[in-house]
A protein has these predicted regions:
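Dynamic "connector" segments at or just before major functional cores
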Residues: 1-196, 202-215, 241, 263
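An anionic, glycine-rich sequence signature occurring as long contiguous blocks
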Residues: 2-6, 10, 14, 244-368, ...
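Short, solvent-exposed helix-loop connector elements
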Residues: 46-53, 348-355, 372-380
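Structural preference for beta-strand elements that scaffold enzyme active sites
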Residues: 139-141, 220-222, 244-246
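Short His-Asn-centered micro-motif
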Residues: 144, 224-225, 248, 343
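Acidic/histidine-rich, metal-coordinating catalytic segments
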Residues: 145, 219-230
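Beta-rich nucleic-acid/ligand-interaction surfaces
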Residues: 229-233, 255
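Short, surface-exposed basic-aromatic patches at helix termini and helix-loop junctions that form
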Residues: 235-244
Length: 380
């Protein structure tokens, strides 16, 4: 059996010259202009002259790239959406995708550093014109962490196998937040895939702290990081700029021995606001105990690099019910320990709770990886 009639021809075209598909770009571009982004690019970005004009008009090209990314473009070809319908009547100076691709390919490491300078100054202006970090004059937090972005192809510059055993590039992010604000990315670095997490971390921390200060973080400023960034250079970079630190410690023999000296009566029980999944014990946990003791870190280094501060320990019961026969209990409780090194002036409970909130940077990384920006991270 077959149809006795030809199928009707159906076609769709979305090229109405009066159609504006991305009207929300208008306030975004106006805010960028009010904060001086085009002027900052024109002042700080200098590309070499070429016969094909690749490096000409960097401000117009950068604004086109920013607008395209805000509109959801995840490739160079997608930048053509800025020239769709009536977009050309709403915005002027929009460049073709091929022009933008040639512009980006002309960048060297030095030109990327120029863009970093633009981003720092723009964030300062954005904080001046908007309530970007409310409460920053009282307390603010800088969180740093790195991640691996998978890449494909054998010729990708800088790609390699890092700590995750995945071939890709290593991205380092610095995030600023306050108790009243959402996290804001203040600094970024794109590094070779095999890069150690702590490579160049001290300079990166210093840059992020300076950016946070320029955005109004004039009060208590605490750097939070995981154990990959536990080092004398990172902590001393914080202290040199008047910032506090709260960094997860590696559980080496010295740290374990120090925790063992804590008196049993010094442990204070706490209850987590929400249950947490314990990967090691493969179970949910909802309570723990905390204590603190003074600790001198980096004793193998010169005296001026050694740091004495608070060691905050958290211990969690090992709940291994699956290994205990039915109807029987354990002879005694066993614990897993987690340690943080901090000079925070807050009380023990508050300092420990604030340290756990370092997980906010993990959410920022997840948002970046699961948004349109992930493809730009891979294409960089």
């Amino acid at each position: 059996m077959q149809s006795s009639h030809a199928a009707a021809a159906v076609s769709s075209a979305f090229d109405d010259p009066n159609l504006i598909a991305y009207g929300g770009l208008e306030p975004v571009v106006r805010l960028a202009e009010r904060c001086g982004l085009p002027a900052l690019v024109g002042e700080h970005v200098r590309l070499p002259a070429s016969n094909d004009g690749t490096g000409a008009f960097p401000a117009a090209k950068l604004m086109s790239l920013v607008g395209g990314m805000a509109a959801g473009a995840d490739s160079i070809d997608d930048m053509d959406r800025l020239r769709h319908g009536a977009m050309g009547r709403l915005f002027s100076g929009v460049r073709a995708p091929s022009t933008l691709g040639s512009f980006l390919r002309s960048f060297t490491h030095g030109h990327v550093k120029q863009l970093h300078a633009v981003a720092r100054r723009f964030l300062h202006e954005l904080a001046r014109h908007t309530p970007l970090l409310p409460g920053a004059d009282q307390a603010a937090y800088v969180d740093i962490d790195d991640t691996i972005r998978r890449t494909h192809g054998y010729a990708k510059q800088g790609a390699g196998y890092g700590y995750s055993k995945v071939k890709g590039l290593n991205a380092l992010l610095g995030v600023v937040s306050t108790p009243l604000s959402a996290p804001v990315i203040a600094a970024t670095r794109l590094r070779k895939g095999p890069s150690n997490s702590a490579r160049g971390a001290a300079a990166f921390v210093a840059e992020t702290i300076r950016t946070a200060r320029s955005c109004g973080a004039s009060g208590l400023l605490v750097l939070r990081a995981d154990s990959a960034f536990y080092g004398a250079d990172v902590i001393n970079a914080c202290r040199a700029l008047g910032a506090r630190f709260s960094i997860t410690m590696r559980m080496n023999a010295s740290v374990k021995a120090t925790i063992a000296r804590i008196d049993e009566d010094a442990w204070t029980p706490i209850k987590y606001p929400q249950a947490v999944w314990d990967e090691e014990g493969q179970c949910w946990i909802s309570d723990a105990e905390i204590a603190e003791i003074l600790y001198t870190a980096f004793t193998s280094k010169p005296k001026k690099q050694q740091v004495t501060a608070r060691l905050i320990a958290r211990r969690v019961k090992r709940l291994s019910a699956g290994t205990v026969p039915a109807g029987q209990g354990t002879l005694f409780d066993t614990w897993r320990y987690h340690a943080a090194f901090t000079d925070s002036p807050l009380a023990l409970r508050d300092a420990e709770r604030d340290h756990r909130r370092h997980a906010v940077v993990e959410q920022v990384i997840a948002d970046v990886k699961n948004s349109g920006y992930r493809d730009w991270l891979q294409a960089a």
